[in-house]
Amino acid sequence: MKKNLFIAFEGVDGSGKSTQVKLLTDSLKKSGHKVYSTCEPTDSPIGSVIRNIFKHRIEADHRVIAGLFVADRLDHLLNKTNGILKKLEEGYTVITDR
């Protein structure tokens, strides 16, 4: 069984992660690879809550925010529709911006 790649770009805000994800995604697609690119926080309902907290500077306990990030990461990994594991099983190289 062929194993597919999961590639994560990590760094501080503004360090070029999204740019690198796009460049690598485009390059691999041009080479004929199936590629699924994603980011965290995700676009899921949980990810939207996280984004709103930071966008609107909503005060929240750091433990609550950490719990939301954990929940978003688990959904990102295990989601039966578009989760990382599902996409790897479908033969995609998965590239994420964290």
Protein language model features and the residues they cover:
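Phosphate-binding P-loop
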Residues: 1-4
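Hydrophobic anchor at the beta1->P-loop junction of P-loop NTPases
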Residues: 6-9
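Walker A (P-loop) phosphate-binding loop of P-loop NTPases
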Residues: 14
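Conserved lysine of the Walker
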Residues: 17
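Hydrophobic positions on the alpha1 helix immediately C-terminal to the Walker A/P-loop
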Residues: 20, 24
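ATP-dependent small-molecule kinase phosphotransfer cores
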Residues: 33-98
